[in-house]
Amino acid sequence: FGVTCLFAFSPDSKQVAFVRLDETNVPSFEWQTFLNDEGMMMYPQTHSLRYPKAGEANATASVCVYDIYYKTIKTMQIPEHMNGYVPRIVWTPIPAPTKADAQPMSDLVVLHINRDQNKMDVLKGNPKSTVCRPFYSEQSNKYFVNYELFDQWQWLADGRVVVVSEKGGYQQAYMYSVQGVEQRLLTPGECDVTQVYGVDEKAQVLYYQVANTPMIRQAYALNMKKNTTTCLTQGEGTHTLYFSKDWKRYVDC
């Protein structure tokens, strides 16, 4: 799934979320080796690896949170029917304090994919209570679900999310509320959003790249307040932008 590790520190660095695999019920596969770098070995070596062949039990994945101060581990309450893959875990930004919640916490977001890889579910979990609730779901009856688009999602400080999906036939960006309700399509048109650079939350501007044709990719800025779009690049070819942290400057490569 394009990852070499599955752990993530919370924005305040007080907790670490990680995926744990339990291979207790996975049968062991054994084999022998007779050669090493020096040639034939006098005594062969036996190796063992837990490997689930077709029809055998797979390793079960669980999402856990380690509290660095209290040195405790909590297991998030993922629904039992979700026994597939967990290729991504991320933390949401820390919300602004309110009168009702003076010390708000980040949520833990869990991406789950079924074994057929044609259905993806996104859960938002409370690391304190370990309760997870459904936030987003997408399923295809013909193709696999492009879970890699999850890496393009933008989690805003006010709880909203810019979701990138192919559900409408084209790869487009949508705005979702903090409850996981679709609010509107941000990038209408018969073309694909190939990259989301990010959101200037202060100015409420979304920066992204669009494949107008297979040979041309331009960069755009969408003012989400005024619902106006500005093309930032000119000329043919592929334009890839690299922005400064304050979103005031960029390099066009």
What spans do the regions from the language model cover?
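Active-site proximal loops enriched in glycine and acidic residues that flank catalytic Cys/His/Asp
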Residues: I78-E80, H112-N114, N126, Y136-Q139, ...
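Beta-strand C-termini and the immediately following turn/loop, strongest in propeller blades
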Residues: C5-F9, A17-E23, K53-A57, T92-P93, ...
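Leucine-enriched alpha-helical scaffold segments used for protein-protein interaction
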Residues: Q172-A173, L185, T228
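Short loop/turn segments that connect beta-strands within beta-propeller blades
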Residues: D67-K71, N126-K128, S177-V181, N223-N227
